[in-house]
């Protein structure tokens, strides 16, 4: 693993790659989606379906001129922060992984609430790309509470897919809506999944739901005990006030570790 560094900002990415825009609700984490709010603000008369059709881009690998956006070649790139690239409306989400695998100067973050489809799609990645060109890629899923953490990890497609030891897996516990034990019970045995990174944060926005500070503290302690880098993005203070300013955090939660070191800067 690259040496850890403390990230200076609440946003852990510096650039985005959005070949699709628009999404569909799948779990409680989606209820106050910021991407949906942005779309309503700037496209008030456009439905999500219309936006999906308008911004859907071709999945072809053939090098030719088209309307297809290319991913940024450097920086820390959040791939699909205005959609879920592993939603069933995206025909070949793994095609974007192949494309970003050609960019060696950046760091590429993929995040989904449909982890089963991500695992299924990753089977289609050519072995040479999988083995030699994805060290700067991080594949993660959202877990808002214990129920959905377990649901996403225990789906058959996830359980049947074996990520290589060198794969960079991460979990986004944001918005955190309940306590989470990052261990899992399989056949009576507690299994600790191997993660490269964990992000945790309270929900933001005027309709934000409760996020107890002890829930965040628990995840931080679990990560410390397991030697997993952890990034505390934003919290609700005991007063009830939301903040993403790290100097307002309790001192023991002023942690914004990223596992890629200076790569992507």
What are these regions (language model features)?
Residues 60-231:
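Conserved AdoMet/S-adenosylmethionine-binding subsite of the radical SAM
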Residues 1-77:
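N-terminal [4Fe-4S]-dependent radical SAM core
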Residues 2-4, 227, 232-234, 238-239:
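A C-terminal junction/extension of Radical SAM enzymes
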Residues 40, 118, 207, 239-240:
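Generic structural signal for helix capping and beta-alpha/helix-loop junctions
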Residues 44, 184, 242-245:
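Short aromatic-enriched loop/helix-cap "lid" or pocket-rim segments at secondary-structure transitions
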Residues 38, 203, 235:
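Flexible loop residues that form catalytic
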Residues 237-265:
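C-terminal accessory extensions appended to soluble enzyme cores
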């Amino acid at each position: 693993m690259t040496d850890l560094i403390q990230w200076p900002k609440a946003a852990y990415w510096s650039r985005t790659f959005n070949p699709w825009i628009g999404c569909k609700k799948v779990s409680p984490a989606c209820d106050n989606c910021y991407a949906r709010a942005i779309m309503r603000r700037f496209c008030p008369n456009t439905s999500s379906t219309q936006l999906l059709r308008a911004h859907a881009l071709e999945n072809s690998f053939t090098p030719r001129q088209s309307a297809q956006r290319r991913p940024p070649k450097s920086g820390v790139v959040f791939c699909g922060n205005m959609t879920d690239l592993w939603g069933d409306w995206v025909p070949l989400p793994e095609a974007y992984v192949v494309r970003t695998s050609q960019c060696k100067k950046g760091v590429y973050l993929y995040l989904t609430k449909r982890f089963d489809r991500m695992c299924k799609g990753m089977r289609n990645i050519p072995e040479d790309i999988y083995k030699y060109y994805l060290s700067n890629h991080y594949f993660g899923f959202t877990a808002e509470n214990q129920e959905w953490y377990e649901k996403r990890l225990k789906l058959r497609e996830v359980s049947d897919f074996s990520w290589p030891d060198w794969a960079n897996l991460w979990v986004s516990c944001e918005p955190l809506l309940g306590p989470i034990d990052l261990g899992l019970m399989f056949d009576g045995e507690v299994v600790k999944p191997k993660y490269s990174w964990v992000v945790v944060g309270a929900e933001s926005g005027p309709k934000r739901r409760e996020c107890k500070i002890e829930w965040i503290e628990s995840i931080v302690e679990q990560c410390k005990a397991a030697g997993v880098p952890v990034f505390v993005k934003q919290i609700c203070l005991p007063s009830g006030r939301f903040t993403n300013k790290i100097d307002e955090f309790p001192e023991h939660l002023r942690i914004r570790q990223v596992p890629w070191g200076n790569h992507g800067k």
